Amino acid sequence: MKKFLSVALTALCFTSTAEAVYEAKSDTGTEIFDYIENRRREAREQKLTEEQEKLLADIAEAKERLPQEPKEGDPVPAVFEGDDMVYYSGSGEFIATGKVDIIQLDGYRFQSERAEGNVKEQVVRVEDKAHVLQLTPGAPRVTLDGYKTVYNYGKKTGTMGNAHGKAGEYYLTGKRFEFYPDHIVVYDGTQTKCGAKTPDYHLSAERMEIWPEQVIRMYNVKFWIKNRIVGTKEYEENQLGEKEKNHFPRVGYNSDHGAYIRDTIEIPIANHLSLDINAYVETKKGVRSNAELKYKNRDFRGWLKYGFYDDSDNRWIQKEPSLDLWYGRHFGKGIPLSYSVEAEVGHWRQRAISSTHQEYEVKLMHDPIILGKYALILNTGYKITKDNAKNVPNGETTVRGSNYSVILAREFDERFAAYVSFSYDKNNSRNSVFNFDVDDYSKKFQSGVSYWLTPKDRIVVGVKWNADQDKFDDIDYYWYHDLHCSQSIVRWRGKRKKLEVRWEFTPW
């Protein structure tokens, strides 16, 4: 099972929203490579482009040429350049033509072939194409190309028509952009993380808002695959840097269940409250879906769950229903630790076994300890599991015990990574009523390697060792292949001789 890895990856999620986990489905601990790949991807996204580096260099040079330092409260200085400039000192009007370049020293660049405006009013007007670059601390990095632009660089307000560009990792288009000091509004816009000229998927919205706290808010949203609408929603909110959201269907095949399709439909009910329909249909056993009434507010989560759930071994459980409450947070103030408390109580069913099931767990997780190319991840916890099954011998059970894991991962280079781990969990299939999300033993070693064969192809091998009985337990082989803006994953369960193939749009 992947229980101990989920604890470790929860710790990674506490450290940064940019490290939210895009999980591989693994039984041998290979999820740690998702953390490594997400971190590499984040580093690439945070790297400045050539034009962003040039803007910072030009700002630094312009500041050196200022006759005096601006006082607090003074307008932010701007620098104007062009092949030909005409300035009317009386009115403040100007006309600039040929490689017009306007830099505002707090991180803005405005470029066009012709611009008019008024220096006294601090207004720039461009009828034809204009290029805008925003690189201000704490705000999303924005690059836009559009038409019929009017911009007041003093008030930081303006408009742009028929524009396209990028905010953070999102590619945007819009019929009209409005600029305000603290946010950007897009009307009749689209957004996607797919950088293709014709993206495989995108979201459209009547109105989008891009806020400095790295948030995109969208209203009256449609979800598209190519040119077909696959869903609608009144409101959607994305965090820039978020990797875990995937709005689109996932399809696949495995030896146990045949071909299948998964999709998640989120229905907003009230502030912080939604109904999630996790739809799942397979060819062998039909519909196995679930529904969750979800509450999410800051560090607290709550779910009322009903339906079918599967683990990494394709074992299924029915929750009829189950209430799951979770609270977790980072200690902060220089303390590299996070903690969480979780309780789940409900009626569970697995084949002929049914029980009132209770789980209570507290976890303590250390932030990843980075030692050069090594990452050390430590966590521990204590869990109480109670069952009261009436239809099986010894169905009334209580299991109390600790769990912990130690994971050491190394990035040898941009292509090659490896890990080794040891974990202990008191809960296992021998002392549990339900054979779900637990191993057959308590102590295990896991290790694996990941290697990029080509820029689009990665192979992963993960192995698991039963340390209770000192015997080899499992081996998984993976082939990840990047397709445009989606990914296919082939998994071969070496010891079990089982195949699984998945295809899904990538959430980055």
Question: Where in this protein do the model-derived segments appear?
Answer:
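Long, low-hydrophobicity, solvent-exposed regions enriched in small/turn-prone and acidic residues
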Residues: 2-5, 19-125, 130-143, 153-508
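Bacterial N-terminal signal peptides
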Residues: 7-15
